[in-house]
Structure formats: structure tokens, C-alpha cells
Amino acid sequence: MRLSEFTTLFLLFSVLLLSASAEQCGSQAGGALCASGLCCSKFGWCGNTNEYCGPGNCQSQCPGGPGPSGDLGGVISNSMFDQMLNHRNDNACQGKNNFYSYNAFVTAAGSFPGFGTTGDITARKREIAAFLAQTSHETTGGWPTAPDGPYAWGYCFLREQGSPGDYCTPSSQWPCAPGRKYFGRGPIQISHNYNYGPCGRAIGVDLLNNPDLVATDPVISFKSAIWFWMTPQSPKPSCHDVITGRWQPSGADQAANRVPGFGVITNIINGGLECGHGSDSRVQDRIGFYRRYCGILGVSPGENLDCGNQRSFGNGLLVDIM
């Protein structure tokens, strides 16, 4: 064999060897997914054994989570989730011991087609950033001079702080159970019997009789928040439809300055208290979380982040714990 032919074969073999050794999936491979239903390990390799799929070893396409067509691993990895919520397991937080885990989040998301999987990669990343930002504000344990800044302390609390009431509104459709209280719980701090009832029905759990499941079962906890996010409550659109660009404001919305963007989501969640009166520290806190999370995911936050000049849709359905 001539020297030139040997050199060519050697170079070809080297290229193939390097290609074979490159990471295959997840954050190490630009969000790529594994084929044939394989798990993506925390190191970026595809496989089907415990080293790839086991708790703590799997970053995406994990057992119990959504499949390749609806997987969140291409949008947010376990390590990104931990970076965003890096103080959620602080000793001062109710959610310590990893209650709000990545696996619980991904598992819950699998029950809601379209969540974090609608549109192009920019739209998907913005939805995850917006969801985690709004829920981080609702559960934050941060303060202005907190270590790593105020926007690193989301998902600290499980239950509404202080001495909340029972949040029971007389209802024949969603009757309050004796001795049960419907104060804020979980990532979105869902409150009131008229929210616990339909949420429980949607996710297949009796939350009217067992409201504290939202603060004791991690998957149910995330499901309660994603249910609220995905569900329109007239005249409000769903948060999902707003952030993915599916919502088109009506004439009444435009007259109220309610235009597509993160600000309308704040209006949906707690506009009766936070929107329509100029600058509000709670709104700015939500925006601060959103900007930070968009930065981690490598996407711009878009426009219309504030709701200071928007008229509210009506009274907020949730309790604000700030």
C-alpha cells in the first residue's frame, strides 16, 4: 500500500473514532434526543440500563417521563433545572430533600400534551422559562441580598406562609370537605375549592378531600401547576396559549393594553393585585426570574414583559405569597 493511501485511511479512521466518541444526546449534544426509546444519561450517552435510565443517572427521556415526541430534555436538562432552582433544597426551605425534583417535573409534564413541546425551540424554551419564573415567584424564599441573588431561590416553599384561612367558597359543584383548607400549595400556590375541585378532576385525584396531596406528592404538586398553566378560565386565555403565540388579543384586550408577552401571564395569574397601576415590585420579581431563566436556556425573553399599563382580567384566582 502506498504511503498516501495509508495516510488517507488513517485520517478516515481517526474521524470515525472521534465521531463515535462524541456525546450523543442532551445538553452535551445541543439537546439531541436518543433514538429507539433509549434514555439519555447525565453524561450525554444513550442506553437502556440503570447507568443511563436510573434515578440520578438520567437527564432526559427517562422512565416515567414523556417519550421522544414530547420530551423536555431537549429544552431543559437536569443540570439546567438545578442551576435555575439552586437553593430549593436549602435547609430553610420547606421543599428541601429534593421535593421539587427534575424527574417529578418531567413526569408531571408528560400528562399535558403540548407543554414545553409546542412550536420551535425558542418557543419551547420561553414556555419553560416563563412557567418556572412565575412559579418561582410564587414559592420564592429569596430576598434582595440573598446568596446568588434573589432569583436563585425559587421553589423554596410548599405551602402558603403565615396563617392562611380555609379559602372555602360555598359551591354545590365543588363543595368543601369538612375540616379541609384550600390555601395556596405547590408551585403555583393553587388556592380555593373552586380551583382544587376541577384540578383534581382533570388529573384524576380527589383534591377536595385531599388538598394536601399538592404539598406532599411531588408529581401531583407539579401537575396542579401545569394544569393551571394549560387551562383557560374565561375571559382569560391559558398561560400556555399566550407564551406559545396561540392567543390573539380581542378588541377588548387591545383596549386594555393586554398584548402578547410575559406580562399578560402575570395578569392571568394575579392581575387583580399586581397589574394596571404602574411599577409593582412583585411584577418586577417575576420578570427578574424570567430574565435569569431565559439566560440559562439561551433564549431572549421577548417583548411586553410588564403589566403595569394593562387593565386586569379580573380578580386573581391564586393567592400571592409574597
Curated annotation (Swiss-Prot):
Q: Give the residue range of the signal peptide.
A: 1-22
Q: What modifications does the entry list under PTM / processing?
A: The 4-hydroxyproline residues are not glycosylated in this plant vacuolar protein.
Question: Where is the Chitin-binding type-1 domain positioned along the sequence?
Answer: 23-64
Q: List the disulfide bonds.
A: 25-40, 34-46, 39-53, 58-62, 93-156, 168-176, 275-307
Q: What is its main location?
A: other
| Positions of modified residues (4-hydroxyproline) | 66, 68
User: Which PROSITE patterns does the record associate with it?
Assistant: CHIT_BIND_I_1, CHIT_BIND_I_2, CHITINASE_19_1, CHITINASE_19_2
Q: What does the induction field say?
A: By fungal infection.
Which reaction does this chain catalyze? Random endo-hydrolysis of N-acetyl-beta-D-glucosaminide (1->4)-beta-linkages in chitin and chitodextrins
Cite the propeptide residues by number: 316-322
What keywords tag this UniProt record?
Carbohydrate metabolism, Cell wall, Chitin degradation, Chitin-binding, Disulfide bond, Glycosidase, Hydrolase, Hydroxylation, Plant defense, Polysaccharide degradation, Secreted, Signal, Vacuole
An example of a GO molecular function for this protein is: chitinase activity
Q: Can you cite an annotated GO cellular component?
A: vacuole
The record's Gene Ontology biological-process terms are: cell wall macromolecule catabolic process; chitin catabolic process; defense response; polysaccharide catabolic process
Q: According to its UniProt record, where is this protein located? A: Vacuole; Secreted, Cell wall
* Pfam families recorded: Chitin_bind_1, Glyco_hydro_19
Job description of the protein: Defense against chitin-containing fungal pathogens.
What name does UniProt use for this protein?
Basic 30 kDa endochitinase
